[in-house]
């Protein structure tokens, strides 16, 4: 049976690696990502007979390619090196962590939100609406876990396998109408110019955000298009 490739993505200090290690134990393969000195850590596990290949991606705050870690993580995801993304967030600082979540949703890849540190949330008397949150995030599964106390681990892996089998992708993140018009125009131009058949929308959003890596890889030199986009900027 083919292994499901699962990427663990999250901010630094969100407990991502602790959660990763809870599944893999000492069964790890450590190397460097090609061309850089950032560690690539992989492990293996299984859930009800389904093998899983787990990849602990570097801790990042966004998918904007400013740091080596961000470039490595983004390249791994965009090159389809993972089948399912587990976005690990610190549930006690949810709003801050969801910036990366929204960027992951823009990719249109299968994403599961792992609300880590739920034990801290409960200790502080905080509440998270576990019914409303998935609706706000495009219908993705939201799973409360505690890597420290090892709770919710089976539920999370069940969600991974089910999500993979159902080929579920999040609903598209929608912006204001005038931005959507610009994104559509640019996405069409990217497809026509470079023959890209997937992720055109994401590349369009990144071009509007002045992402340097995407600007270098997919420059748009059509003056008519540029004039129509000149007043638009997504941060």
Where are these regions (language model features)?
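Conserved nucleotide-binding/hydrolysis micro-motifs of P-loop NTPases
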Residues: 35, 59-60, 91-95, 117-122, ...
């Amino acid at each position: 049976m083919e292994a499901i490739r699962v990427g663990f993505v999250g901010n630094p200090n969100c407990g991502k690696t602790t959660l990763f290690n809870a599944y893999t134990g000492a069964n790890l393969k450590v190397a460097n990502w090609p061309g850089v000195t950032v560690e690539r850590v992989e492990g293996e596990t299984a859930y009800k007979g389904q093998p899983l290949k787990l990849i602990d991606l570097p801790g990042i705050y966004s998918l904007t390619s400013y740091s080596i870690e961000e470039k490595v993580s983004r390249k791994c995801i965009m090159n389809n090196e993972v089948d399912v993304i587990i976005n690990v967030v610190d549930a006690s600082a949810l709003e801050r962590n969801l910036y990366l979540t929204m960027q992951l949703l823009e990719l249109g890849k299968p994403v599961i939100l792992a609300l880590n540190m739920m034990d801290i949330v409960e200790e502080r008397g905080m509440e998270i609406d576990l019914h409303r949150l998935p609706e706000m995030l495009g219908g993705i599964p939201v799973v409360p876990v505690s890597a420290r106390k090892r709770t919710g681990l089976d539920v999370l892996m069940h969600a991974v396998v089910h999500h993979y089998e159902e080929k579920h992708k999040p609903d598209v993140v929608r912006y204001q109408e005038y931005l959507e018009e610009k994104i559509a125009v640019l996405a069409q131009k990217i497809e026509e110019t470079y023959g890209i058949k997937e992720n055109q929308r994401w590349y369009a959003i990144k071009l509007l955000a002045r992402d340097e890596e995407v600007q270098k890889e997919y420059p748009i030199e059509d003056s008519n298009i540029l004039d129509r986009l000149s007043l638009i900027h997504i941060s």
